[in-house]
C-alpha cells in the first residue's frame, strides 16, 4: 500500500499535467514493485479506479469538510461526491477499505485478498 497526496488517475477539474506527471514518474514504480493499492486525497471526493492492464486499486479519499463533484472516467469502479472518510482494516489474508459518508453510512467497500 502506498499513500500520497495527489491522484495518479482520477476525475478532477484540476490541471491534467499534474496527473500525467504522476502517471509518468510514479505509476511505473508502483507497477514494478507490485503495489496493490495507491491511496490519496487532494480532490475531495471518493473514487475507486482500476485502469486497464493494472492490478492496482487507485483510491481517492473524500474530505469530511468539503466535497467536490465527480464523474466516472475510464476504469472507474465507484465515485461519489459525498463528504466523508475511509476506514481500512487489514489482517494476514485480507484488506477492507470502507468509504463512509458524513452520517456514518458505508457507501462502498473495496476488498483485496492475499
List the predicted regions and their residue ranges:
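His/acidic metal-ligating clusters that form di-metal
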Residues: 1-59, 86, 106-109
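Binuclear metal-dependent phosphoesterase catalytic core
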Residues: 47, 51-114
Amino acid at each position: 500500500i502506498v499513500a500520497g497526496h495527489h491522484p495518479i488517475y482520477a476525475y478532477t477539474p484540476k490541471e491534467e499535467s499534474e496527473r500525467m506527471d504522476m502517471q509518468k514518474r510514479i505509476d511505473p514504480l508502483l507497477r514494478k514493485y507490485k503495489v496493490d493499492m495507491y491511496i490519496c486525497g487532494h480532490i475531495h471526493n471518493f473514487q475507486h479506479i482500476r485502469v486497464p492492464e493494472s492490478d492496482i486499486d487507485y483510491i481517492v479519499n473524500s474530505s469530511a469538510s468539503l466535497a467536490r463533484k465527480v464523474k466516472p472516467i475510464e476504469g472507474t469502479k465507484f465515485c461519489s461526491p459525498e463528504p466523508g472518510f475511509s476506514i481500512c482494516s487489514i489482517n494476514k489474508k485480507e484488506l477492507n477499505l470502507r468509504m463512509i459518508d458524513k452520517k456514518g453510512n458505508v457507501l462502498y467497500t473495496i476488498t483485496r485478498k492475499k
